[in-house]
């Protein structure tokens, strides 16, 4: 950190342009107003596709970085408005159409429902009896558990929050309009990274966490403590009563009687009755101790508020991002040269570069969250709702996958549109690009090695089982392939808190070791033992993830040029082939790598969620008898069945699809129809992926001829989708069909097993 004399630094000022762009409904009402070509109106059917492709491609609408920045900034507010409306709808359903209040009275027996179907053509069958005399569709979003942890005790509070969501949405829409049409920030404001970091760290993350910690302490803790003790929700004081009357809090947490005295006298240990360090799970609810999570958010708030004072703005003290980057010369062995010189300019002038990094980080974080949701279930009673646990895991894994592919997409767009080779000479980025052949060929070798070896283990096992030679298989009972490193890591995590957190009463997660936590006779979490089957699936994960990385990284590193197409950057981010007369140059654009990466992302994550689903049903989820014996849902069949391809097909896909296939005539029948519809959408995608554009153009021309014959020819000339558009429609339906099919399969299964 350096302290600089005040005159050296340019002062940070918030400067805006007033009324830069007039708001005109007349202009917005004209389709394609953002592009001179599109604004002329449609001559062919390609127009409608280009309209959708370019509406949000601000780079194609203007080359002015300031205007692009303002558009993105304004669009963020629009995005937030949509999120608030969506959240408001969730809370409104909880208030108006749910059994939340009944569920609070008996959360282990009554199932959560927040949707009731109107029986117009007999859909009433979908309204199952979820307990407590309520009929509706069982939900697996986990919102009931979040609401209980937040301290909601009645529908009226949910109503108020729903209205609050709509108010916030309105505020966001206003802000989006105001900051583009009335007071639009200048480019310097968007590029002032030190102020941005300080505000985001201290304000968004720091004060955001502090506010949540405050809510948890003053509202969630007392309400949940009383609910856990069996007090009826209607008898619990309302949130404002706890906030305004400290004597009510002192009855539950005696330290409240002392007020802020211990804080200012540094006698903080007094507050340990509500800021705890227990570890493990609450034995009543199977969720993390709320007093632990309040403590966690308070600590996070302190860290981020400190972090938000780290960067130098107007006070001549703190870090300068540019100085840090320019001063970082990198590892002399691997990436010497100019190190990170020039990267500050890259990240402040290319929002694609910035977005690529943020998407990669956020996507990875989402997948980490997926694993924490079951290993350390944060909300009360969440852990024994297996449908919700499976849904939350799948959701966060898939979101992470899409964001990581998005990182590859925007990395490639950055390379094509924003990268300036002259400004990146011998720095880390330039050296990575110059090492691309070594990187990609090594990655390719890794993929081949992993693919042949992991698949080879399965082929061996299927062959041995087919020939009736179980003693020659790789399994826990024959030739063992124990994941010794994973077991060591598990054991380390189980034992480490004893040394690193000596005051914690229990391990962070029982998934690593310890006891079985059961709530109302159902397993919430227990140690997850790993064996040969996990070792084999793990290497399939390694294989598919490395292939996804290979495709995305090749797309980024070869986005501007390659030996095959040296002038690729002139062709842009998306193009089908390198023009007529050059065969064998298709699917080389940055866009095509994203297209192919999406298939491998889906492939790779399907195996992840299948592994999770079966492993949990086989080795974790189940019922606990009074004598402590655990009966797992599928009776521990994972270890012996998941070691052959046939086992995966027979004992996972086929056996567990029984619930969705046999769902007709029951409350789960909608999933049966969705299962078929998902297969149909998936099959429909293949029509776009397997056929070429010329086939359809020929067909269309003969249809147009027939229309001309009948004198009903359209004014807008029909055209086949472009090659890229066809692939886009194909991959969209492939993923949609696959996701819907998996959704129906998982939900019908998990709701059937309770």
Swiss-Prot record:
Substrates-to-products reaction catalysed: reduced [plastocyanin] + hnu + oxidized [2Fe-2S]-[ferredoxin] = oxidized [plastocyanin] + reduced [2Fe-2S]-[ferredoxin]
Enzyme's top EC category: oxidoreductase
4Fe-4S among keywords: yes
Pfam family, one: PsaA_PsaB
Membrane topology: Multi-pass membrane protein
The entry's keywords: 4Fe-4S, Chlorophyll, Chromophore, Electron transport, Iron, Iron-sulfur, Magnesium, Membrane, Metal-binding, Oxidoreductase, Photosynthesis, Photosystem I, Thylakoid, Transmembrane, Transmembrane helix, Transport
One Gene Ontology term of the molecular function aspect: 4 iron, 4 sulfur cluster binding
Binding site for [4Fe-4S] cluster: 577, 586
Gene Ontology BP term (one): photosynthesis
Residues holding phylloquinone: 696
Family assignment from sequence similarity: Belongs to the PsaA/PsaB family.
Assembly and interaction partners: The PsaA/B heterodimer binds the P700 chlorophyll special pair and subsequent electron acceptors. PSI consists of a core antenna complex that captures photons, and an electron transfer chain that converts photonic excitation into a charge separation. The cyanobacterial PSI reaction center is composed of one copy each of PsaA,B,C,D,E,F,I,J,K,L,M and X, and forms trimeric complexes.
Protein name: Photosystem I P700 chlorophyll a apoprotein A1
Organism: Rippkaea orientalis (strain PCC 8801 / RF-1)
């Amino acid at each position: 950190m350096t302290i600089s004399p005040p005159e050296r630094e340019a002062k940070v000022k918030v400067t805006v342009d007033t009324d830069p762009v007039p708001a005109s409904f007349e202009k917005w009402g004209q389709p394609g107003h953002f592009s001179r070509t599109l604004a002329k109106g449609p001559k062919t059917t390609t127009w409608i596709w280009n309209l959708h492709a370019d509406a949000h491609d601000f780079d194609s609408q203007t080359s002015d970085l300031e205007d692009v920045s303002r558009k993105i900034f304004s669009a963020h507010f629009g995005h937030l408005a949509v999120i608030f409306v969506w959240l408001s709808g969730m809370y409104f359903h909880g208030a108006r159409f749910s059994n939340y209040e009944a569920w609070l009275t008996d959360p282990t027996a009554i199932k959560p429902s927040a949707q009731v179907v109107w029986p117009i053509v007999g859909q009433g069958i979908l309204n199952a009896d979820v307990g407590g005399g309520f009929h509706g569709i069982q939900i697996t979003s986990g919102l009931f558990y979040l609401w209980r942890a937040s301290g909601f005790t009645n529908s009226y509070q949910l109503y108020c929050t729903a209205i609050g969501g709509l108010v916030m949405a309105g505020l966001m829409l206003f802000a989006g309009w105001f900051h583009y049409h009335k007071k639009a920030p200048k480019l310097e404001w968007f590029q002032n990274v030190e102020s941005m970091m300080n505000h985001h760290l201290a304000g968004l993350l720091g004060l955001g966490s502090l506010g949540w910690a405050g809510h948890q302490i003053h509202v969630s803790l007392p309400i949940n403590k009383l609910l856990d003790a069996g007090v009826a929700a209607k008898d619990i004081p309302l949130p404002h009563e706890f906030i305004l009357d400290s004597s009510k809090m002192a009855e539950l947490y005696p330290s409240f009687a002392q007020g802020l005295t211990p804080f200012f006298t540094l006698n903080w240990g007094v507050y340990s009755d509500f800021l705890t360090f227990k570890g493990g799970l609450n034995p009543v609810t199977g969720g993390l101790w709320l007093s632990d999570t309040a403590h966690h958010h308070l600590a996070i708030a302190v860290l981020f508020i400190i972090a938000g004072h780290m960067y130098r703005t107007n006070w001549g003290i703190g870090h300068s991002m540019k100085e840090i980057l320019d001063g970082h010369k990198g590892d002399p062995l691997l990436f010497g040269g100019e190190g990170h010189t020039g990267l500050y300019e890259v990240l402040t002038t290319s929002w694609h570069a910035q977005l690529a990094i943020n998407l990669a980080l956020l996507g990875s974080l989402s997948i980490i969250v997926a694993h924490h949701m079951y290993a350390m279930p944060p909300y009360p009673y969440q852990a024994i709702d297996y449908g919700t646990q499976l849904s939350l895991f799948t959701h966060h894994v898939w979101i992470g996958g899409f964001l990581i592919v998005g990182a590859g997409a925007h990395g490639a767009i950055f390379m094509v549109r924003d990268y300036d080779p002259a400004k990146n000479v011998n720095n880390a980025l330039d050296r990575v690009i110059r090492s691309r052949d070594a990187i990609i060929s090594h990655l390719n070798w890794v993929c081949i090695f992993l693919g042949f070896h992991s698949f080879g283990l399965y082929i061996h096992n299927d062959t041995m089982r087919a020939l009736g030679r179980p003693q020659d298989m790789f399994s826990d009972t024959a030739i063992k392939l124990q994941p010794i490193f994973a077991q060591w890591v598990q054991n380390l995590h189980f034992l480490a808190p004893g040394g690193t957190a000596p005051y914690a009463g229990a391990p962070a997660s029982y998934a690593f070791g310890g006891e079985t936590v059961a709530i109302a006779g159902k397993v919430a979490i227990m140690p997850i033992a790993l064996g040969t089957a996990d070792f084999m699936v793990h290497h399939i994960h390694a294989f598919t993830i490395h292939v996804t990385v290979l495709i995305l990284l090749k797309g980024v590193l070869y986005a501007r040029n390659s030996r095959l197409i040296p002038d690729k950057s002139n062709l842009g981010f998306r193009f089908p082939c390198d023009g007529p007369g050059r065969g064998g140059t298709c699917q080389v654009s940055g866009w095509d790598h994203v297209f192919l990466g999406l298939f491998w992302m889906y492939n790779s994550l399907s195996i992840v969620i299948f592994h999770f689903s079966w492993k949990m049903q086989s080795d974790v989820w189940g019922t606990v008898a009074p004598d402590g014996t655990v009966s797992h849902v599928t009776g521990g069949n994972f270890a012996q069945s998941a070691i052959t391809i046939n086992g995966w097909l027979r004992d996972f896909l086929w056996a567990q699809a029984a619930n969705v296939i046999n769902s007709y005539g029951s409350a789960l029948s909608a999933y049966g129809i969705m299962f078929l519809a998902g297969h149909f959408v998936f099959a429909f995608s293949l029509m776009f992926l397997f056929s070429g554009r010329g086939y359809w153009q020929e067909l269309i021309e003969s249809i147009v001829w027939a229309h001309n014959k009948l004198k009903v020819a359209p004014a807008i000339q029909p055209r086949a989708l472009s090659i890229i558009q066809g692939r886009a429609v194909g991959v969209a339906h492939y993923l949609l069909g696959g996701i819907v099919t998996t959704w129906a399969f998982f939900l019908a299964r998990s709701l059937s097993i309770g």
